[in-house]
Amino acid sequence: MTDNKPLAGQTALVTGASRGIGAATATALAEAGAHVILVARRVKALEEVEDRIHEVGGTSTIAPLDLTEPDAIARLAGAVAGRWDTLDILCIAAAYLPELTPLSQIEPKEYQQAIMTNVVATQALLSAFDPLLRRAEKGRVIGLTSSVGDTPRPFWSAYGSTKAAFDNLLETYGQEVARLSPLRVAIVDPGATRTDMRARAYPGEDPDSLKPPEKVASRLVELLTEGFEAGHRERID
């Protein structure tokens, strides 16, 4: 580890790494010295992120994957375990935003997709990578949440309910592992950020009024470098 490469020698896995906050975080982690496993569905988009990582002098491995496919996460964990003895950092940035609509008009398929991505996949990730995270000297998990998970808003019930479950999974896991290992779990609300998901939710909003994903990524790297206590939560404004 050096001052300009504080995460040198560490391995990180980022879901939702093909765009937005996930892509920015993956790039920032690599620039800080970590080898980053990039997980998302779109190969071309992952390759573009990998190119940016190479431009900043970092290294990465592409892992194209649909987190909602049966056994996909278990296969990924097996592949990672076959190459690395530990996983130092798990950043869960993947999320699915269903159409904003009154609760009575939620489309079942949309809601199911949100549940599978935001809830079921999260539990599967924590379970599958638990052994590798515990083997790390100081394993860390960061989950990116949303304020609608604990502050219900009209038309946001489909997404908000899945983020509430997301938070519960992470908080519970964090309490469980804190008693038995140095592994720590944090939940971070990135706040209003210039992403495609934000543009879908607020189509009339001026994107220039929002902070870029890189600001969120910078804070996450800072948090991972400095370390954090069990149960850490914060919002990035």
Explain the meaning of each model-derived region.
Residues 11, 18-19:
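Conserved glycine-rich cofactor-binding loop
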Residues 183, 187-188, 195, 203-237:
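C-terminal helical subdomain
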Residues 96, 134-179, 192:
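Catalytic loop of short-chain dehydrogenase/reductase
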